[in-house]
Amino acid sequence: AKAALNGAYHDLAANAYYGGKYFDAGINLASDNVTWTGSLNYYYDFDTHQYSAENQLLSYAWYAIYATVEQANEVISKTPTIDSSDEEKNEIIAEATVIRSLALFDLARTWGNIPVIKEATSTPGQFNGVKQSEAKVVYQTVIDDILAVYNNLGKATDRVHVNQSVADALLARIYLYLEDWDNAEKYATKVIENPYYELTTIDNLIDGSLTTESIWELAYSSK
């Protein structure tokens, strides 16, 4: 189960997702932070706000994020059958649930209305025809999912695994999208007041990793 959970973390870090292209295209190029001077049209489309559903970066990100959802669903569905303590199984399921919630949140805030898939795939075409859910419905769904497993998450002891503080930070962000300012402040304050996190120096922020200011980072290895 832990190996499968590591697979969900791996999918989050995919090149088409948090590993690079999703944020190159979805955030930076579509804003005025950077501009594109190369020859690849799928980057240029974002820089000029002329992208379509056929854009390669968009399709890569779509598949990569739903691959993360699928892997998390596999963990959630199969973990109850493993030979381990209930505490360990519940924590694994909780981590996978938060990972799935982040992926569904990213899909909704990027594309708007999306199909919400919360079951592992067992047959080809199983989810053909699944209706889209409105973005606000998706946001509330993932909030409910996170809160349902919150108490099974561990406390903050490292910066590369999902824990209660990671869930707090994600909840704060989702509540911002719902314009629920009170709950956004509530969960953000929980992170701010956690002594495990504090501001770091500008040099560490730029050149370092896993600094005291980092709530959650995806781990990479050269192996």
Q: Which residue ranges define each predicted feature?
A:
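Extended ligand-binding clefts on enzyme/binding-domain cores
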Residues: 14, 179, 185-223
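Conserved, well-structured interaction surfaces
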Residues: 6, 10, 41-111, 151-157
